[in-house]
Every structure is written in C-alpha cells, then in structure tokens.
Amino acid sequence: MIDLSGVFIPAVTPYVPGTGEVDLPAMQANLRRWAASPIQGVVLAGTTGEAVLLDEAERVALVHAAREVLPSHVLLTVGTGLESTRATIRLTRAVAEAGAQAVLVQPPAYYKGAMTPEALRDHYRAVADASPVPVIVYQAPLRMSTLDL
C-alpha cells in the first residue's frame, strides 16, 4: 500500500523553446528544487504535465530522468491513461519498469457512448490486474473527458 497523504507536486512538463522537445534537464532542475522541500511525491504526465501532448516514449523518458534526481522516498506517480486498455497497460508497465511507483489512469473518452459502467469497470480491472504498481483512478472532467465516474 502506498501513502497518498502529504503534498504531491503536479509537475509541468517543460519544453525546449522553438523545438517542442521535452526539456529533461529543465525538468530535473525543477525536481531537484521540489525534492529539497518536505514533499510526499511528484506527479508526472498528469493534467498539469501536458499528458495529452506526450507520446509514450516521452513519458518513459520523463520517468527515467526523474528517478535520476529524486530521492527514493519521494513517490513518483505517472499518468498512463490512453484511449485503449492495451495501450494503457503497455505504458503502465513501461513507466513502472522505469521507476514509477504508482500510476494515474483517466477513463478512455473518445468513444463516450461505448463507455458504459461495465466497460469502465472492465477497463480499470484489466489495467489494475496487469499493473505492477498501484493504479489511481483519475479524472479531470473539465480537461480530459466528459465521462462521469
């Protein structure tokens, strides 16, 4: 069981001006600064972290870069929710292997009409069963979907 009490920093994802590439050194500088404070954890690739703009490889690279600078006691949580269960599971496993200790999974929203309570239950159950780390059900309805959980 993970401890979700305390302060978690919802990290923004910095980009290199003019290129659109993720600026890993800038992100590491931010993480070093935050880790010097009494925080419980950091959230990467959430709503504040521009998750919808990041591909899977970029999310994994963020985790590797974060683990290089964060102390082990700082809980690293990463957004892995994608539009398919298979893709969400694949990314969840990849970020866990890279050092994430928990994941945030928002509901698939593209096919809203197909997202019945049973479909959502099956999606989250499949992700949780396949995940090597705890799964946190996540939703930012004004930004990420119009589904009611």
Regions found by a protein language model. Name each.
Residues 2-147:
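Active-site beta->alpha loop and helix N-cap motifs at the rims of alpha/beta catalytic domains
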